[in-house]
């Protein structure tokens, strides 16, 4: 079965590596054009391109599929299936119609929940106890195609979105291999999504970063976890701006006003929330490095 793979970031590279190691016939790889990276602004290859070149696979990097020449280039590869993982482009119908067995996608949520570009982050932000990945067919509507299979995993109580993504990449890669194997054997069934149950996971932005201490400790903790490693929750402590990298939930103090410092322990700085409290374990002052909270405040003592 001839497979064309489309993807860009690390999660996609993990999936591509998995199906190549399984001996699948990948006849072409599509990824985003090379982009300037870091201060040097040198063009950098995507993680998927790195894997493809290491396996001597042809790489295609169109800006879009508006040009007929670009569509014909894909058609010439004669794919039986197109497998898409975090490609970063919406495929037009004329592309979806090319592969005989269809275009499939690995989406990092349990659809129909969290359709959109930041599914695993929103699962953490929303305080979900479990999430997973869905193998699905692509259609014109975003993340609304028929489902093929899912794989579920619990979310750790202190797990960040970044840590969760690392695990979902492995789970998604295994699900992609399983799905392609089943497609080759003609064993795939389609299950329509219940759109009435759909929720959406829009892109994150920095307006979401400031912590509102009137929220519950659980909500603050979920915000810190869900916005890590980007864009990272923020707050001011005694006039200094901080990025907050890690928290845990701790018992509150009755009558304490939200945002009040309850104390500095051996493990972190405890702050009252609207309900309960959190202990900041790791933070980063503006212009500084990430540090354990006790280490920072040892060098920058709190005001009485």
Name every feature range the model reports, one short phrase each:
Residues 21-22, 32, 81, 85-200, ...:
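Donor/substrate-binding cores of folate-linked one-carbon enzymes
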Residues 214-304:
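An anion-binding loop in the catalytic cleft
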Residues 7, 29, 52, 82, ...:
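A residue-level signal for conserved active-site and pocket-lining positions in enzyme catalytic cores
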Residues 25, 56-58, 102:
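Conserved beta-strand segments of alpha/beta enzyme cores
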Residues 8-11, 63-66, 87-90:
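Short beta->alpha connector loops
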Residues 202-215:
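Acyl-group handling in specialized metabolite and lipid biosynthesis
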Residues 1-42:
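N-terminal Rossmann-like dinucleotide-binding module
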Residues 36-78:
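N-terminal glycine-/serine-/threonine-rich beta1-alpha1-beta2 phosphate-ribose binding loop
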